[in-house]
Amino acid sequence: MKKILAEIAYDGSLYHGFQIQPTKPTIQGEIEKALEKINKTKVKIQSAGRTDKGVHAKRQIISFYIKININLKNLKTAINSLLKNDIRIIKLKYVSNEFQPRFHAKKRKYTYYILNNENHYPWEEYQAYYVRKKLNINRLNTMAEMLIGLHDFTTFSCIRDQTNSKLKEIYLAKFKKKNKFIVFEIIGSSFLWKMVRSIVGTMIDIEIKNESVDTFIKILKSKNRKYARTTAPAKALFLDRVFYE
């Protein structure tokens, strides 16, 4: 059997996250069903990360074994023909049996889209968080810079997150203006469950209330979940890229 790496994209709006669940539609479940039809036996996929309910991906990485003899171009076409239009295989390639999408990943990049313009089309809110009040991008970036480096992110973790260590290293965190949108980009070693959404929601809350930007670092350093503010909606978050070098 050969091990294959797949780069995939998906709209997570109608799914209960990436990870398979027995009675609910998930990204993993849909892909494994498609692979089983092609492979004529069950296929278990591994992923670089498990996105939450409603979260999307531009370049998620998965791997799986397949026993049938088929070239990658035809395999890609076959898988996509069995998937719904909101999940796509973008690229396939062979990898060594030792490759693990999650454990070999060096960094992950997430992007979060904030719609910050009253003059917008209704559908522009579909995958963005609409904030009516005009946001000060300079203040947001001052808070974002406080994330750079190694920090304990207990404040921005979720009670249900059973990860032993809450220490994560952040390499990049910045807000950029893009037409009607403010886009938050963050690159880190890995992320806790709902961590990015909690960070974004807290920064926006501080900005809307015109509190001192130093409030953010105090909240981060408190290592206490009760001091985090609103958790921003899932619909605006994308797993953008996974780095292996």
From Swiss-Prot:
* Disulfide bonding pattern of the chain: none
One of the Pfam families matching this protein, by short name: PseudoU_synth_1
Q: Which InterPro entries does the protein's record reference? A: PsdUridine_synth_cat_dom_sf, PsdUridine_synth_TruA, PsdUridine_synth_TruA_a/b_dom, PsdUridine_synth_TruA_C, TruA/RsuA/RluB/E/F_N
Q: Which CDD domains match?
A: PseudoU_synth_EcTruA
Q: Which residues make up the binding site for substrate?
A: 110
Question: Which residues lie in coiled coils?
Answer: none
Gene3D superfamilies named among the record's database cross-references: Pseudouridine synthase I, catalytic domain, C-terminal subdomain, Pseudouridine synthase I, catalytic domain, N-terminal subdomain
Keywords attached to this entry: Isomerase, tRNA processing
Its UniProt entry gives the catalysed reaction(s) as: uridine(38/39/40) in tRNA = pseudouridine(38/39/40) in tRNA
Q: Which GO terms describe its biological process?
A: tRNA pseudouridine synthesis
Could you name the active-site residues? Answer: 52
**Gene Ontology terms, MF aspect:** RNA binding; tRNA pseudouridine(38-40) synthase activity
Top EC class of this enzyme: isomerase
Task: Tell me which EC number(s) this protein carries.
Answer: 5.4.99.12
Quaternary assembly: Homodimer.
The record describes the protein's role as: Formation of pseudouridine at positions 38, 39 and 40 in the anticodon stem and loop of transfer RNAs.
Q: What's this protein's family per the entry?
A: Belongs to the tRNA pseudouridine synthase TruA family.
What protein name is recorded for this chain?
Answer: tRNA pseudouridine synthase A
Q: State the encoding gene.
A: truA
